[in-house]
Amino acid sequence: MAVQRTFSIIKPDAVAKNVIGEITTRFEKAGLRVVASKLKQLSKAEAEGFYAEHSARGFFGDLVAFMISGPVVVQVLEGENAIALNRELMGATNPKEAAAGTIRADFADSIDANAVHGSDSEAAAAREISYFFAATEVTAR
């Protein structure tokens, strides 16, 4: 398997709980490397643009409101099979269905406040990384 890059957001609920380091440590212990990272307060326009694919869905307004409710950490992770590995580490979207020991099982409160986001495909990863990072901000390790 080739080295991949994936995109991660540590969401406002997890940032508020002060577990940024614990979540990042899980990525690193699993073999992923952080190659870009920013602590950022999303604007409404940024959140709407990032989640535009969900704009027609009933939860869109609540999702945007949640994502601008506090700072987030946006990261680019790199490693073997990074996309699938990150999704495995995150666990199911609904923390009640997430396997024990996953990030969402340990840190998420609900399906809405579910601690983290991760790219679900190579195309999504490329799009999401470029939404928040210029190529010069991503540094191979």
UniProtKB/Swiss-Prot annotation:
Pfam families: NDK. It comes from the Bacteria. ATP binds at K11, F59, R87, T93, R104, N114. Its EC number is 2.7.4.6. InterPro entries: NDK-like_dom (IPR034907), NDK-like_dom_sf (IPR036850), Nucleoside_diP_kinase (IPR001564), Nucleoside_diP_kinase_AS (IPR023005). The keyword Ubl conjugation does not apply. Its cofactor is Mg(2+). Its main location: cytoplasm. Keywords: ATP-binding, Cytoplasm, Kinase, Magnesium, Metal-binding, Nucleotide metabolism, Nucleotide-binding, Phosphoprotein, Transferase. GO terms for cellular component: cytoplasm. One of its GO terms (biological process) is CTP biosynthetic process. It catalyses: a 2'-deoxyribonucleoside 5'-diphosphate + ATP = a 2'-deoxyribonucleoside 5'-triphosphate + ADP; a ribonucleoside 5'-diphosphate + ATP = a ribonucleoside 5'-triphosphate + ADP. The active site is at H117 (pros-phosphohistidine intermediate). It is found in: Cytoplasm. PANTHER family: NUCLEOSIDE DIPHOSPHATE KINASE, NUCLEOSIDE DIPHOSPHATE KINASE DDB_G0292928-RELATED. Homotetramer. Belongs to the NDK family. This is Nucleoside diphosphate kinase.
